[in-house]
Structures are given as structure tokens and as C-alpha cells.
Amino acid sequence: KLIHYSTDYVYAGSNPNASEEDIPIPDKTWYAYSKLLADEHIIRHSEDYLIVRGSHRINPFPYDTAWQDQIGNFDDVDILVDQWIKLIKSEQKGVWNIGTPTKSMYEYASREKDVNSAPAPDHFPKDTTMDLTKLNNFLKTYDEI
């Protein structure tokens, strides 16, 4: 099985709360374009794959300023890795969005420490929210096993 960690940035030019079935439209970054190219190559050339789209952050938040206008489903790397491991152990396939409820980067950073707020630079996507319905339904079932 081919397992690929992609990014929520592939949805940055899409509608908010993009689902796995939506056509991803990356925003302004080469990072997003390169991840989407990898995703599409895997989908076209592999039958047994798991593509996980998410955005993890290190904990504690390492900066003194956080962006109040960048929103997404990002969270601590250990939380998202737990979701990823459950998908792998249960031999899931296809494309999966992983993350936690929508929040701003400022809200995320403020959970751990006092930070200043500022707008995100123009070259960063502002909205990378994803539909997590598929993941949440899976996690309910997985946790019952």
C-alpha cells in the first residue's frame, strides 16, 4: 500500500469545508500545487493507496504572533497522527481529510500561551477548512471496536 501525507492547502482555492470528493483547487503556493500533483499521480497510477489531507502544528506553538484570519482544521501533530494511525491500522483506502473542528491560527495558538494576533501574509491561504464527516463517522465506528 502507498501512504501519502498531503495537505489541506490543496483546498485553499476551493469552497470552504471541501470534502474528499470535491475537486481540489490549490491557492497561491507551490507547496499546494506539488502536493496536488502527487495526489493525482497516486490516484491515477495506484489501486492500493491512502492519501491523508491535513495540517499539523508542533506543540507548543513556537511563535509570539498568530494569524487571526487563517482558519482550518489544523491541530497538534500528536492528535492528527493518532487519526492517521487508526486509518492505517484499519486498512482504509482512498482520500481522507483529517483534522479537528475549525479554528483560526490565533485560537489554536492561544490554547497554549498568550500570543499577539496579526493578519496572515498574502501568500498564505486564508481558508483551508475541510469537511470531516467521513473521518468523524469512521472514528465513531473505530472507537466502538
Task: Give the ranges of each region predicted by the language model.
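Amphipathic terminal alpha-helices
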Residues: 132-145
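Mid/C-terminal beta-alpha module of Rossmann-like enzyme folds, strongest
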Residues: 80-131
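Short glycine-/acidic-enriched loop or helix-start segments at secondary-structure transitions
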Residues: 12-15, 61-62, 107-108
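Active-site Tyr-X1-5-Lys
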Residues: 26-55
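Conserved Rossmann-fold NAD(P)-dependent oxidoreductase catalytic core, especially the SDR/UDP-sugar
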Residues: 1-28
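Conserved sequence/active-site signature of Rossmann-fold short-chain dehydrogenase/reductase
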Residues: 10, 55-59, 103
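Substrate-positioning beta->alpha
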Residues: 51-54, 62-89, 94
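Hydrophobic anchor at the start of a short beta-strand
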Residues: 2, 48-50, 95, 115
